[in-house]
Regions:
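A short alpha->loop->secondary-structure connector
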Residues: 51-60, 83-85, 110-117
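Short, well-ordered beta-strand core segments
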Residues: 63, 93-94
Length: 190
């Protein structure tokens, strides 16, 4: 987990966000990087920021927006601009906290989402009960990759990661990193 703790990835800390993407890609070389912005992030800005990195290894997969069904209309009205942007930009929309809602309430929300975004796949059933094919479908089958024997060999051999010329921007960033290190966020440190 790589956390931007101050500012917004879609506006005020855009440069930090973009440099973090490159740093993560160049140091960890992940197959996938999941960006989980706060609920008030402007999704279209984040997508534009990722696309503006201009690095062929980094591309945006179909965005997934998760919406609390119980507060759907409240937040749609209270944070209209951000809410509408997240719904319009999503390829998949998953309702959460649906277990105590009636089918009629869920269908009302579904119809309202359809008025905003006719193309998104809208999932109104409880995601806790879904199988692996559901989760794979969120990313058009791209989430689970077959492991090659080369990749398995690399995983077995990899025991450490080192950085050259690493530095913290300020003491607060260093303290944050050291706290995460002590808490085991970066694996077993011997």
């Amino acid at each position: 987990v790589w956390e931007l703790t101050s500012g917004c990835a879609c506006c005020s800390t855009k440069a930090d966000f973009m440099s973090s993407l490159l740093a993560i890609d160049n140091t960890l070389n992940p197959d996938f990087l999941i960006v989980e912005p706060s609920g008030i992030a402007v999704l279209s800005n984040i997508i534009n920021n990722v696309n503006n990195v201009g690095y062929e290894r980094i591309k945006v997969l179909p965005p997934v927006t998760i919406i609390d069904a119980g507060t759907y209309f409240k937040y749609k009205n209270k944070y209209e601009e951000v809410f509408m942007d997240q719904v319009k930009m999503a390829s998949h929309i998953q309702l959460s906290k649906v277990e105590n809602m009636t089918e009629e309430e869920l269908n009302t929300i579904f119809e309202d989402i359809r008025k905003i975004n006719q193309n998104a796949e809208v999932h109104i059933s409880d995601y806790h009960n879904q199988d692996i094919s559901y989760w794979n479908s969120l990313f058009s089958g791209e989430l689970v990759k077959m492991e090659s024997s080369d990749l398995i060999d690399v995983k077995k051999k990899m025991q450490n990661v080192s950085y050259k010329n690493a530095c913290a921007k300020n003491p607060a960033v260093l303290a944050f990193f050291l706290d995460k290190l002590i808490l085991g966020y970066y694996g077993d440190i011997n």
